[in-house]
Amino acid sequence: MTDSPRPVSRRTFLHRSTGAGAALLAGGVLAGGTAAAAPPARRLAPAGIAPADLDPLALLKKMLAFDTQNHGEGGVTRPHAEMLKAVWDSAGVSSEIIPTPKKDNVHLIARIEGTTSAAPLLLLGHSDVVPVERAKWSVDPFGGVVRDGEIYGRGALDMKGANAAFVAGLLRHLNEGGRFDRDIIVLTDCDEEAGPHGSRWLAEHHWDKIDAGMVLTEGGWFLAQKDRTTPMLITVTRQDKVYFNLDIVADGTATHSSKPNPDSAIARLSRAVTAIDTWLAPVTLTPVTREYFSALAEATEDAPFKRALELMLAARSQPARERAAALVVKRSSYPWLHRALLRTTHAFVIEDAGYKENVIPSTATLRLNCRGVPGGQRPRDFLAGIRERLEGRDVTVKLVGNAGESEEDALKRLDETFSRPPSSIDSPLYTAIGDAAAKTYPGAVFAPALFEAGTSLYPWTSKGIPGYGVYPYVLDNDQLIGMHGNDERIAVAALKQGTDFMYRLFDRFRVR
């Protein structure tokens, strides 16, 4: 294409001796200003694709209409898969629904045939979503309501919005008669949010259908300047935080509720929670997170925030690093995100205590969901720190492992995940992402990053296949923290611009 900048290289993004830095892209805003022009329509040989399926907003509304809530053991994803299969059928793309042992919980695999035997590109997007608290939503969470320029719905951000951008971007190429230099596999998986039949199960039973040379899924955030609209930092994640759970268990005497006892399990658990409520694990900066925060310092127009980032990156002692990191979080427009990227986190997620109002229970349990920084603090060291913090409080801290797994075996498994290197930035997909960012978000900085959450990438990355993540829409902080929350939403303009981004990304693999 004539608007293509010079090819992106490793040197472009890692231009400092420490590996810190990012590519600066020239001029433009998302809203309230001039955005990059949309790619020209090139209609070569239109396929039988419905016009609505080329529109990411219309496609997202169709996806949101399906209730694919996953309460822990998988959801009902077949109707959603059948809808999407019809979309692929209309485009002349072969697709297959893969049932799992759970009724109506399925995967969908579509394969666009390429012109060579090059290793396929796989797009990975889950169809299941977390449950909703309907009473706390201001709109129908499955209604696809558009209000004040934002589309609301469970999965609008995570990750049906991304799926809509992925699919609509590909369909635009197919509608133009485009072909690609390799197969492109689109896997719409289930059980990403929880359940036994996710991507690992699929890899065990159908690896031949999803074997690929590189994978793109959810992950990297597209952040805005302090004005909440101007694109600031476009990131692609190349590594996930390490996921593990701890249970804090308190025991006491069970008795009739008319006789409150001094060794109440619930009271003991509450005191333990207080002891770690505001406690933070140590700040750890790895090459991946240093690269990210260096790019953020380059990208921001907020001078006090920039200074805080520079202080943190330059800190020579742990106390100085902790003080500067606290300032970074305080001055950030995305404080929860940046606090999560700095350290191992622990979140209070499930409390289990009591079963009848006239019985004081003998046991109370709190689950902590923890996310460790790979290459930072090891999960076993975090566990030791929590136990030390709660020593003498009459509670037990247990690492939650797999069925039949000892604590040491679970820690060894986590050590292996913790030590796995990030995906390489020397790949055609990484280059394509950077090139698309340069064309779509001029004026923003592009950089690799760590994903503070988790993905379905394990079956590929465990085999050394590079996997990356993006949420292809610019978000403000309110939208970002709506992920898994109430009134989840994204901006319609951001979704459409993100689809342009995906179109340009796929253009790198198009045959001329």
Pin down the residues of each PLM region.
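N-terminal secretory signal peptides
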Residues: 1-12, 22-28, 34-36
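Metal-dependent amide/peptide-bond hydrolase catalytic core
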Residues: 38-42, 51, 221-497, 503, ...
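N-terminal helical capping/dimerization or prosegment-like subdomains
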Residues: 40-134, 363, 367, 379-383, ...
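Stable alpha-helical elements in mature extracytoplasmic
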Residues: 55-60, 80, 84, 162, ...
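Sec-exported extracytoplasmic/periplasmic mature domains
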Residues: 61-69, 89, 93, 171-175, ...
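Solvent-exposed loop/turn segments at secondary-structure junctions
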Residues: 69-71, 103, 116, 127-131, ...
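Active-site metal-coordination/substrate-binding segment of hydrolases
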Residues: 118-188, 194
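Hydrophobic, small-residue-rich alpha-helical packing segments that form membrane-like cores
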Residues: 188-214, 218-235, 241
